[in-house]
Amino acid sequence: MLAMMLNTTLSACFLSLLALTSACYFQNCPRGGKRATSDMELRQCLPCGPGGKGRCFGPSICCADELGCFLGTAEALRCQEENYLPSPCQSGQKPCGSGGRCAAAGICCSDESCVAEPECREGFFRLTRAREQSNATQLDGPARELLLRLVQLAGTQESVDSAKPRVY
């Protein structure tokens, strides 16, 4: 009788331990565990936006040099696929803000949001001009400065309601 109770108790403990430990595994950990990510090379994030000209910065953020950033719009839907890929990625040129990277002219994005950032203005205009062949829709200096100023004003007067889709 004692052996049967001991056997039942031991089986119950083993099953409880198995149930507890199986709940601790994450499905999207990188190969080799989370510490192995420093050894892995970062790949370019998925292309997104009109004509695939942009790059994903987060699950709902798509930015392109010439087009700006799309937040929570149809152009950024493809970026949700990044959550299911096993290797880490990085978009943008140089680090900016608090954990973000320069995404477009004057815009700094992290994986959660974008803000106007003056230090991200450098280099984008030259890069855009080098890429364009002869595009009549490209903005000239004064128009570009006005648009950039409007983006900066929108970033400083951003409302609390961030659930609405936005395009920067």
Swiss-Prot record:
Its main location: secreted. The modification Glycine amide is found at residue 32. The record marks 32 as: Important for agonist activity on V1aR/AVPR1A. Keywords: Amidation, Cleavage on pair of basic residues, Disulfide bond, Glycoprotein, Hormone, Secreted, Signal, Vasoactive, Vasoconstrictor. Transmembrane segments: none annotated. Residues 1-23 form the signal peptide. Disulfide bonds join 24-29, 45-89, 48-62, 56-79, 63-69, 96-108, 102-120, 109-114. It comes from the Eukaryota. One of its GO terms (cellular component) is secretory granule. GO terms for biological process: grooming behavior; intracellular signal transduction; locomotory behavior; maternal aggressive behavior; maternal behavior; multicellular organismal response to stress; multicellular organismal-level water homeostasis; negative regulation of apoptotic process. It is found in: Secreted. Glycans are attached at residue 135. InterPro entries: Neurhyp_horm, Neurhyp_horm_dom_sf, Neurohypophysial_hormone_CS. GO terms for molecular function: neurohypophyseal hormone activity; neuropeptide hormone activity; protein kinase activity; V1A vasopressin receptor binding; V1B vasopressin receptor binding; V2 vasopressin receptor binding. Belongs to the vasopressin/oxytocin family. Interacts with vasopressin receptors V1bR/AVPR1B (Ki=85 pM), V1aR/AVPR1A (Ki=0.6 nM) and V2R/AVPR2 (Ki=4.9 nM). Interacts with oxytocin receptor (OXTR) (Ki=110 nM). Neurophysin 2 specifically binds vasopressin. Vasopressin has a direct antidiuretic action on the kidney, it also causes vasoconstriction of the peripheral vessels. Acts by binding to vasopressin receptors (V1bR/AVPR1B, V1aR/AVPR1A, and V2R/AVPR2). This is Vasopressin-neurophysin 2-copeptin. It comes from Rattus norvegicus (Rat). The gene is Avp.
